[in-house]
């Protein structure tokens, strides 16, 4: 070998390499890398190393990379000399094995203890542990021996005197050393001539593509080939996730994931402080870049990462469609094809547009839920969308008996079965035929024979049938058998179970041998579906068992034919019972009562040609979901024909009817009949159907091509266009892995064998179909697809306009209600501030067409209040005074004010000294002496509708949870049946779920995958549709003069056939700007207040909002008669809505609120995202602001900026951007600074991700304060109500063990820390309130079989009686059954409880354990001992 020759003569011959010899060679198989170690008495320079590389590359061209390391060749050296003079050589050698430790080893303390022992001390515990893990002592000892021939022992010791160094400190130290080296290297580089200096500093500065470090010239390696030995390498790829970590010293570490689609890896970067913000800005998701860095083991991540030195932004060269005339894709799936399509509609449309395609179709499986996204993408990328669907076609026009005419049940029938070598009538052979002849209801003849297939029978067929080769080797061949079998049949009706399969073999063989065959055919599968609909499956053995017919030796033709004959005879008896006496009557009755849910489905492509077609498709989608859903939304052929106008029907893929019929080798006449339903036929790349080869359905690729050719010719012969499509399920070939993972997760055994269902260019498709001939391929790929695209109108699946419902006279009614209510409060002459506000609001509301929304909300609230349930408003509707005057909300947006309920005297506080009327001191009317009412929370109307009144209003209302269904039903009364639909939602795979799919896949495949690649795979699987649902309270309203199909199809949530709820097919967000959406939400607070009112007789509306005792609860529990120490809580807000959580309780402790307006601010702060933590909390703590002046609700921003003299419209725009988490533009930041807005305020705005409206916060606090009032003054009613409505995690067992058990359980849950579950959290809340209740002297009473309610906690003289459902293991339904049964009389035994009360054995045991069944005998039977 050449390598051996080099080693034999290991001194290089070139003069420039004189004295250099090869010391050792290492080959790394995984990365195909050669490492050459040379020795020389002189120092080997870079030019010589380059020459050595050339020598090896010349001789060994097949290595991907050759690395050369040089050592000094010295003799007569000892260990001390090595440590003092040649340590750097050792360090450089160690880098071969441990690439990241250079500077650390240089800075270590070295001491030679005796002649052959080296003691090495190092003070960085982080790196020390890594080096120990790497077996550093052995590597160092071996390296010294290899390089210098000196044997020694190494003792590596942690020097604790230097203190410990954590990971981040170590990284900062490393980064400082790197910077130092870069500076050092740059000084050296200045001496090199410019033309040889690839990293010249001036060139670097000019290169704007450099993000960090220097330019990178070497070729990148595949990320999949990187391992711990890789050292310093270059990679190239797409950044897909970033994370910024801030150290204690304020330095920032940039961590990001990068992929080249061979794998992915984590990259870490420590930018210079001056460059940090720029680097963070440039390293974003989607960046395509080249990186050079060192591969190191990260002990925190427990895997290798790259410590980046250089990062260069690159222009990505992407695949383009360069054909002069481009194709159009007419079969494409998005993420809305449930668990099947991998890419978003936008990404697919963006690619098609980028390639210059004039149009692209969207054809998801059975749904059209990608349309809204596609519509927006079409506008964005200026491309036509062809809206379509791949439906599930049911051919409901196929009779049970074909060509049977008026044949009677007494006629002659031949029931037969065949066994074959496989599934293909073209490639497989018959090996057995069995038949029985039936006439006048009796078996009159039999036929049975083996058939020699002239080939070996496959093993799986032998296993299935028991027919071996020796059994058929002497049997007659099919050409001998078939004429005899045809003679046996005569003109009988041919019968089989799944006749399509068996008859196809007979037809094919008759055709091959020129035998005429045209007998009537009856299939017993649809016959049994018609007669026995109660069955779920209709396999022969299942039907036989159901009818009590024996089936011996299943999968033998003779036995199967006999059993099928018996089934036919039983079916004939049942048909006669139905007075069906002939096959024509049978077909007629079958078509009348056909259950298409049990019929086979075919794929079909339906494209929308125009607006009429769009509406028809929406109707078709709706009916398929509402009336014909069984596993899939099925579309009967008759239904498609009913809505066919404006639609174009295509034959779809290999699962389509046309492909299947061609595969079955049907006659031309039969095929002509089948294709008459379609407008165009479809062919696809043969590799899409490779599974058919694997499964033995077709023989090879050539047969797949033949099928496509037949479909093409069939279309041409019938003057029908044929198109070539990709059947796109993912964007690029690399994306197939996501589909593999999801399919594997669903249990598909063939998930690994992914067909290439990616989007192809025109040239790729032309090459794919070149076997058709150049002209035909061009026609199918380009001409016909473009013609179809051109024949389709540009349409919008959702109209742009808004279509609010119309109520005659709504404008006048709203105005009248408003003014009348205002006069009733403020008097005949309205205060100017009220009059101006109402006039402005009414004009804005009426002029923009929103009066009807107000009127509807008023009617819904009025209905609830009349029925005794308060309604809480949500969102910013509390900003609208008109909403207050029309009784939609209790929140009054006027400035704080007094008003006399008698003489209407009023006084408004407009100087900003008070934020809420509730905080005003009590005051008597100066005119009539009565106590003045206090109101007003100072909320600008513009928060709701904007300064132009053009912001879409959103009125959210909190109804009692137990009353919500009544209100939903009432909307139908208001708008009419068929005009009200629940707001639909689409449930997609969340990242957490996707992560589970990925981890399962990796585990099952036993793959070793880095975290970055797991993250990439997780992101790729996220967002794929899984199911559908409904908004908890959203109702979409269609105007009387319109219909839902102009906006969306409709369906049931989660395709649940058992529910009466109908939802929009589109996610409600897609159409909420077009149709009115009412938010009729269920909430506990109104339910709680109703129950408290029922128990106490106190009207919640009359409760003062600033009662001193009540307000004190938010800073101390003293008003409850307990102290903070015994309660283990510094405030008294356990169980109060919005203020009972641990997080908000701590906020109360931190802020010490003393007013209603303080509570409003706390509510706003606690509900926002990044509003309190690391924001207002910090600025208050550091003294920049106070609770009263920080940013708490969205309204604060606009109000404050207007006070700072910013133009109102700009103030509103800034508020809207900030509240949605969009930060501030440079222009907005500049104008804020110009108006002296403080820096902390600007920074606070930039941190906010989401903000609560003040109107919402006020409404919540009003409810909380009212409930708190009952907690203080009516404690028993409060606790009974709380546990009845909110305590789903009540633990009766712990509660009745006593106070000590409760406190122990509280401590146990608190000790769980981050491991606490949601159930634990719920239980903790319940136990804390139980503890508080005990401290207040109120106790629980055990459940009683006759005294307890099913689900409500009842007040008794001695305490609160728990309900039956509060006992563990006794659910609410079981409790209700018992309560209903006891109304009929007491239970006489456990047996009676079981029968009348429907109590299961488990329920009875749990009731007994709780002590509810004392004295109740086991049985109804009396004995002497019972007397």
From Swiss-Prot:
Where the record annotates domain Exonuclease, the positions are: 413-568
Is Calcium included in the keywords of this UniProt record? no
From the UniProt record, list the reaction(s) this protein catalyses.
DNA(n) + a 2'-deoxyribonucleoside 5'-triphosphate = DNA(n+1) + diphosphate
Q: What would you give as a GO molecular function for this chain, any one?
A: DNA binding
Extract the SUPFAM superfamilies matched here. AF1531-like (SSF160975), Nucleic acid-binding proteins (SSF50249), Ribonuclease H-like (SSF53098)
**GO biological process terms on file:** DNA-templated DNA replication
Q: What class of enzyme is it?
A: transferase
**Annotated InterPro entries:** DNA_pol3_alpha_NTPase_dom, DNA_pol3_finger, DNA_PolC-like_N_II, DnaE2/DnaE/PolC, DNAPol_HHH, DnaQ, Exonuclease_RNaseT/DNA_pol3, NA-bd_OB-fold
Q: Which GO terms describe its cellular component?
A: cytoplasm
Q: What is its main location?
A: cytoplasm
* Compartment list: Cytoplasm
Keywords, alphabetical: Cytoplasm, DNA replication, DNA-directed DNA polymerase, Exonuclease, Hydrolase, Nuclease, Nucleotidyltransferase, Transferase
The entry's function note states: Required for replicative DNA synthesis. This DNA polymerase also exhibits 3' to 5' exonuclease activity.
Per the record, the similarity remark reads:
Belongs to the DNA polymerase type-C family. PolC subfamily.
Looking up HAMAP family in the UniProt record yields: DNApol_PolC
Name this protein carries in UniProt: DNA polymerase III PolC-type
> Taxonomically, what lineage is the organism?
Bacteria, Bacillati, Bacillota, Clostridia, Eubacteriales
């Amino acid at each position: 070998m050449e390598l051996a020759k080099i080693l034999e003569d290991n001194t290089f011959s070139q003069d420039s390499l004189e004295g250099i010899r090869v010391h050792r060679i290492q080959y790394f198989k995984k990365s195909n890398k050669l490492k050459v170690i040379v020795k020389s008495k002189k120092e080997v320079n870079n030019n010589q190393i380059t020459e050595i590389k050339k020598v090896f590359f010349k001789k060994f061209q097949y290595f991907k990379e050759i690395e050369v390391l040089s050592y000094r060749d010295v003799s007569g050296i000892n260990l001390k000399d090595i440590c003092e003079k040649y340590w750097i050589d050792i360090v450089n050698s160690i880098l071969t094995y441990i690439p990241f430790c250079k500077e650390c080893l240089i800075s270590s303390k070295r001491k030679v203890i005796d002649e052959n022992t080296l003691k090495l001390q190092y003070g960085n515990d982080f790196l020390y542990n890594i080096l120990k893990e790497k077996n550093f002592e052995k590597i160092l000892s071996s390296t010294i021996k290899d390089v210098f021939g000196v044997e020694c022992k190494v003792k590596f010791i942690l020097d604790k005197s230097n203190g410990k160094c954590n990971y981040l400190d170590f990284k900062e130290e490393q980064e400082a050393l790197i910077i130092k080296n870069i500076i050092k290297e740059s000084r050296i580089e200045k001496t090199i001539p410019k033309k040889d200096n690839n990293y010249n500093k001036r060139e670097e500065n000019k290169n704007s593509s450099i993000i960090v470090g220097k330019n990178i010239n070497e070729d990148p390696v595949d990320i999949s080939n990187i391992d711990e030995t890789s050292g310093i390498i270059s990679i190239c790829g797409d950044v897909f996730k970033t994370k910024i970590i801030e150290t204690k010293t304020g330095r920032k570490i940039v961590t990001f994931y990068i992929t080249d689609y061979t794998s992915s890896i984590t990259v870490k970067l420590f930018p210079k402080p001056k460059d940090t913000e720029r680097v963070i800005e440039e390293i974003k998701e989607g960046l395509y870049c080249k990186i050079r860095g060192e591969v190191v083991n990260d002990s925190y991540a427990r895997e290798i990462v790259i410590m980046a030195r250089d990062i260069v932004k690159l222009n990505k060269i992407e695949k383009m469609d360069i054909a002069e005339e481009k194709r159009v894709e007419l079969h494409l799936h998005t993420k809305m094809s449930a668990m099947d399509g991998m890419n978003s509609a936008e990404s697919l449309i963006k690619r098609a547009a980028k390639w210059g395609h004039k149009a692209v179709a969207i054809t998801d499986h059975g749904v059209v839920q990608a349309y809204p996204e596609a519509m927006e993408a079409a506008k964005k990328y200026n491309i036509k969308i062809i809206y379509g669907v791949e439906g599930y076609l049911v051919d409901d026009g196929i009779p049970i008996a074909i060509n049977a005419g008026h044949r009677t049940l007494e006629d002659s029938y031949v029931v037969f079965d065949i066994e074959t070598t496989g599934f293909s009538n073209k490639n497989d052979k018959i090996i057995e035929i069995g038949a029985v002849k039936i006439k006048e209801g009796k078996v009159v003849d039999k036929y049975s024979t083996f058939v020699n297939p002239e080939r070996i029978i496959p093993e799986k067929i032998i296993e299935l049938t028991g027919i071996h080769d020796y059994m058929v080797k002497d049997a007659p061949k099919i050409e001998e058998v078939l004429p005899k079998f045809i003679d046996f049949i005569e003109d009988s009706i041919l019968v089989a179970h799944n006749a399509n399969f068996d008859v196809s073999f007979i037809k094919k063989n008759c055709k091959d041998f020129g035998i005429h065959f045209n007998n009537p055919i009856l299939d017993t599968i649809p016959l049994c579906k018609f007669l026995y609909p109660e069955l779920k499956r209709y396999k022969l053995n299942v039907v036989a068992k159901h009818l009590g017919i024996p089936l011996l030796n299943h999968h033998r033709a003779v036995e199967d034919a006999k059993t099928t004959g018996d089934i036919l005879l039983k079916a004939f008896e049942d048909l006669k019972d139905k007075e069906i006496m002939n096959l024509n009557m049978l077909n007629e009755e079958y078509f009348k009562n056909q259950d298409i849910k049990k019929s086979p489905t075919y794929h079909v492509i339906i494209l929308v040609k125009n607006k009429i077609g769009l509406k028809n498709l929406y109707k078709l989608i709706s009916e398929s979901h509402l009336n014909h859903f069984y596993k899939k939304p099925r579309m009967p052929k008759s239904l498609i024909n009913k809505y066919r106008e404006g639609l174009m029907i295509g034959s779809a893929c290999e699962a389509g009817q046309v492909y299947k019929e061609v595969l079955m080798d049907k006659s031309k006449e039969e095929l002509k009949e089948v294709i008459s339903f379609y407008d165009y036929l479809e062919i696809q790349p043969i590799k899409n159907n490779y599974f058919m080869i694997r499964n033995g359905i077709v023989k090879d690729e050539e047969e797949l091509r033949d099928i496509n050719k037949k479909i093409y010719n069939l279309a041409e012969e019938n003057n029908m266009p044929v198109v070539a499509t990709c059947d796109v399920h993912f964007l690029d070939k690399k994306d197939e892995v996501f589909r593999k993972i999801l399919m594997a997760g669903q249990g598909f055994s063939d998930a690994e064998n992914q067909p290439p269902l990616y989007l192809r260019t025109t040239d790729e498709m032309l090459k794919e179909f070149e076997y058709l001939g150049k002209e035909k391929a061009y026609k199918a790929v380009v001409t016909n697809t473009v013609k179809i695209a051109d024949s389709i109108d540009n349409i919008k699946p959702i109209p742009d306009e808004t279509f609010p419902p119309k109520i005659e006279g709504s404008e006048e009614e709203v105005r009248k209600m408003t003014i009348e209510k205002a006069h009733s409060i403020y008097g005949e002459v309205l205060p100017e501030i009220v009059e101006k506000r109402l006039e402005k609001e009414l004009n804005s509301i009426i002029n923009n067409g929103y009066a009807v929304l107000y009127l509807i909300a008023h009617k819904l609230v009025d209905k609830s209040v009349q029925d005794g349930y308060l309604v809480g408003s949500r969102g910013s509707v509390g900003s609208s005074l008109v909403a207050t005057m029309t009784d939609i909300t209790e929140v009054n947006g006027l400035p704080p004010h007094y008003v006399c309920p008698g003489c209407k005297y009023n006084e408004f506080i407009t100087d900003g000294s008070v934020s809420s009327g509730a905080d005003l001191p009590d005051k008597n009317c100066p005119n009539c002496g009565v106590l003045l009412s206090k109101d007003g929370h100072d909320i600008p109307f513009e928060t709701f509708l904007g300064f132009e009144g053009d912001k879409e209003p959103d009125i959210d209302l909190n109804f009692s949870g137990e009353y919500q269904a009544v209100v939903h039903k009432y909307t139908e009364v208001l708008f009419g049946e068929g005009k009200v639909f629940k707001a639909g939602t689409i449930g997609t795979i969340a990242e957490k779920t996707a992560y589970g799919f990925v981890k399962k896949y990796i585990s099952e495949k036993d793959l070793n995958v880095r975290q970055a690649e797991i993250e990439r795979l997780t992101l790729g699987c996220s967002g794929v549709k899984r199911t559908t649902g409904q908004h908890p309270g959203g109702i979409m309203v269609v105007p009387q003069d319109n219909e839902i199909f102009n906006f969306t199809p409709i369906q049931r949530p989660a395709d649940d056939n058992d529910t009466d709820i109908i939802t929009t097919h589109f996610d409600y967000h897609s159409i909420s700007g077009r149709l009115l959406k009412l938010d009729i939400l269920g909430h506990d607070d109104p339910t709680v207040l109703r129950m408290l009112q029922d128990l106490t007789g106190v009207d919640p509306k009359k409760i003062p909002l600033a009662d001193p005792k009540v307000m004190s609860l938010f800073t101390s529990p003293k008003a409850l008669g307990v102290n903070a120490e015994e309660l283990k809580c510094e405030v008294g807000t356990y169980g109060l809505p919005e203020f009972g959580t641990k997080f908000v309780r701590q906020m109360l402790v931190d802020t010490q609120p003393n007013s209603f307006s303080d509570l409003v601010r706390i509510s706003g702060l606690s509900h926002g995202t990044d509003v309190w933590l690391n924001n207002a909390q910090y600025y208050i703590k550091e003294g920049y602001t106070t609770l009263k002046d920080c940013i708490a609700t969205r309204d604060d921003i606009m109000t404050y900026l207007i006070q700072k003299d910013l133009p109102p419209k700009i103030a509103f725009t800034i508020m809207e951007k900030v509240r949605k988490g969009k930060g501030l533009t440079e222009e907005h930041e500049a104008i804020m600074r110009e108006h002296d807005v403080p820096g902390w305020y600007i920074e606070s705005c930039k941190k906010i991700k989401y903000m609560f409206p003040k109107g919402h916060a006020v409404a919540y606090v009003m409810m909380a304060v009212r409930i708190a009032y009952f907690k203080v003054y009516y404690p028993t009613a409060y606790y009974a109500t709380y546990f009845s409505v909110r305590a789903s995690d009540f633990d009766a067992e712990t509660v009745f063990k006593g106070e000590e058990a409760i406190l122990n359980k509280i401590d146990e849950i608190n000790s769980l820390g981050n491991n606490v579950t949601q159930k634990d959290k719920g239980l903790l809340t319940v136990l804390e309130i139980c503890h508080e209740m005990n401290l207040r002297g109120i106790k629980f009473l055990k459940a009683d079989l006759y005294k307890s309610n099913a689900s409500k906690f009842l007040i008794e003289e001695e305490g609160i009686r728990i309900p039956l459902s509060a006992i563990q293991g006794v659910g609410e339904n079981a409790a209700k059954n018992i309560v209903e049964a006891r109304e009929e009389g007491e239970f006489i035994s456990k047996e009676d409880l079981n029968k009348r009360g429907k109590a299961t054995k488990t329920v009875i045991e749990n009731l007994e354990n709780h002590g509810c069944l004392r004295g109740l005998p086991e049985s109804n039977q009396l004995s002497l001992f019972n007397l």
